[in-house]
């Protein structure tokens, strides 16, 4: 799916679906992963897609381009990242699920990072949505992950302490752009 930010896009909360939505202005609607209980009060007032949203969109889109996700999955991840950055309530870190590293990482917004599950040693890929001195708000940047018996899916949010994060190693596969 190829989408491009537009000043006609608008944010709104859909009570029927209990989700934050983004009207993409060309007959397409994006339904986020986030329900009312996860959203800040300003999510319930309709608002336009601003220049800051567009800049953040391009940051996330550029960083996700090299991921092994399909184009539809990348679009879903990027749009959920925008919702999380703008409207998600603060989360408490859930770092006990992941192994600590000696050198805490200071990730940048939009950076792909990896975590190692403490119970299995499995690696998971996350997208940093918001960075802080000690922890980062991240979204799951892979189709699924089981964390302590609970399933997470692409775009689910989790806050992780920086000492659990490590740089994500890109897969060494050749990817070709597709001409349309």
UniProtKB/Swiss-Prot annotation:
HAMAP family: ZapC (MF_00906). It is found in: Cytoplasm. Keywords: Cell cycle, Cell division, Cytoplasm, Septation. Interacts directly with FtsZ. Pfam families: ZapC_C, ZapC_N. Contributes to the efficiency of the cell division process by stabilizing the polymeric form of the cell division protein FtsZ. Acts by promoting interactions between FtsZ protofilaments and suppressing the GTPase activity of FtsZ. Belongs to the ZapC family. GO terms for cellular component: cytoplasm. The gene is zapC. InterPro entries: ZapC (IPR009809), ZapC_C (IPR048372), ZapC_N (IPR048373). One of its GO terms (biological process) is division septum assembly. This is Cell division protein ZapC. It comes from Pantoea ananatis (strain LMG 20103). Coiled coil: none annotated. Transmembrane segments: none annotated.
């Amino acid at each position: 799916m190829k989408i491009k930010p537009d000043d006609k896009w608008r944010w709104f909360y859909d009570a029927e679906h209990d989700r934050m939505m983004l009207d993409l202005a060309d007959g397409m609607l994006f339904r986020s992963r986030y329900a009312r209980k996860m959203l800040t009060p300003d999510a319930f007032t309709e608002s336009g897609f601003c220049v800051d949203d567009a800049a953040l969109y391009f940051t996330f889109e550029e960083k996700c381009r090299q991921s092994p996700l399909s184009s539809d999955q990348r679009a879903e991840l990027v749009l959920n990242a925008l919702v999380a950055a703008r409207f998600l309530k603060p989360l408490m870190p859930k770092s006990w699920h992941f192994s600590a590293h000696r050198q805490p990482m200071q990730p940048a917004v939009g950076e792909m990072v990896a975590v190692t599950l403490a119970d299995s040693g499995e690696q998971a890929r996350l997208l940093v949505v918001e960075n802080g001195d000690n922890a980062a708000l991240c979204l799951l940047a892979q189709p699924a992950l089981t964390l302590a018996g609970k399933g997470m899916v692409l775009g689910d949010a989790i806050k992780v302490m920086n000492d659990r994060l490590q740089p994500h190693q890109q897969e060494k596969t050749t990817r070709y752009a597709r001409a349309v």
